[in-house]
Structures are given as structure tokens and as C-alpha cells.
């Protein structure tokens, strides 16, 4: 049973937990983290969701819900390790964006690693494929309706593009 901490609309901890899968009450929110792994050459890691999951066979960045008692950064680092086998210190993660959407606060992080897909260990029940794409390819996947969740990506797309470009310049 997965438990989440609950927050109010101002992201103040409510002092109660919630069981995943049970609808939230109005005014209750939980934290979700997205994490983009970016290579020094500017390519981004995307993973393909397991076909039995909601949005199955679609591409996404790594992410998930923060567990009760877990900080946003620790959640992102845990999801990165669980889903693709990449260990990162939470303090290495750079917050790219925070948005409140529906019943959640979504914190989007980036971390830079010089990896190939062969370096990854995919979590079989979550992820069936992974690849590194440049920003143009990523945008095309989004335009083709093959990247989820669509509305979140649209919110931080320019911030992600700027991070990728800045990172590429710093590594050339």
C-alpha cells in the first residue's frame, strides 16, 4: 500500500496521509516528481511505459509520486534509481519547474549524466524501453501525441530547452 502526504493549495502539509488509488478530497494535493536525465551532448532520456499501465506504450520522462515522509528531491532520486537504475544524490538534482495541476504539485527536476541506454537497468513492471533523444525529436514525439503527460510537458518545455542548451554550451 502506497501512502502519500497531503497538502493544501498553498503546499502546506495537512498532517495526514492518503492511500494511492483513493480519490482525494477537494483542497487536498500530493506531490509528483518528474526527472529529466540530460546527457552533456544535450540528449534527454525518455522511457516507454509498460503496456498494462495507464498511457501504456507511450514515452515519458522518469517520475512518480512522493511517498509519505519523503521530500520531493528524494522522491525524484528514488524514482530515477527504481525505474532506470541511475543513482543520484538528491542534492545533485536541479529544480526546473513547479506547477499545481489538478490534485497535485508537480516538481520537475533535471540531472546531468553521461550515459548510454546500455548503462540503464529498466524496471520491468514500469518501463519497456528507453532511448536518448535530442530536443527536436522530443518535441516531435510530443506533437505526435506519444509523450505523456502532455499538459505538464507544455508547461515546462521552454525551461527544459533552455537548460539543455545551456548545458550543451557548458560542455563544449
Place the predicted regions along the sequence by residue:
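Acidic, metal-coordinating catalytic segment for phosphate/diphosphate chemistry
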Residues: 1-34, 38-40
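A residue-level structural signature of the nucleotidyltransferase/glycosyltransferase Rossmann-like core
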Residues: 4, 28, 43-44, 58, ...
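Conserved hydrophobic "DFG−1" position in protein kinase catalytic cores
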Residues: 6, 37, 46, 110-111, ...
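Short loop segments at secondary-structure junctions
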Residues: 10, 39-42, 50, 112-117, ...
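Local beta-strand/beta-hairpin segments that build beta-sheet-rich folds
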Residues: 14, 94-96
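Nudix hydrolase/Nudix homology domain
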Residues: 18-21, 56, 68, 97-172
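A glycine-rich, hydrophobic loop/mini-helix early in the fold
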Residues: 32-63
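The catalytic Nudix box helix
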Residues: 45-46, 61-94
